[in-house]
Amino acid sequence: MENTKELERLIVASNNKNKLREFDAILGHLYSVVSMRDAGVDADIEENGVTFEENALIKAQYVMEKTGCAAIADDSGLEVDALNGAPGVYSARYCGRHGDDEANNDLLLENLKDVPAPRTGRYVAAIALVRPSKAPIVRRGTCDGEILFERRGQGGFGYDPLFQCETGETFAEVSMETKNAISHRKRGIVAVLEELSKEQA
């Protein structure tokens, strides 16, 4: 796969430190991963799409237009089957405030209190790569699991302490290496890279 010149510097359309760390861990050996703030874009981009894909595209497009450089963005969240896919695109602000992980987890537990195990669901990440003068690439990655009855683990962020993945551990218990090998974000990024590879073949 060609990964020189045009994509050597890749701006992540986020200032979320946790997401940036994951993007860098997954893509850092291929590209110089830069946050949008470090690229000179300091904005709170309005995510008004109704799907993960729309929101990811909105963010990547905004940063690409501001910088003229390739930008990658994700929009991710948790879909719980017993809640008809909620919290979904509202995962980060499920409790009504943006980014309050504790309150979001509390509300999720409350809304699932009468639901027996297995409480199935999945993490979803839509990844959008937007480049000047080229068609955007948007792909989705998922990671199936179960929602536990109480938090486990000290790592991760978001709903990670309640999300038990295929290893039997929560995303807050697994190592960063394990999470980055199986996560929804990794799978979405790999799907984008595969499409990019086809385009450049």
Features from the language model and the residues they span:
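Anionic-ligand binding patches
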Residues: E2-I11, K17-A201
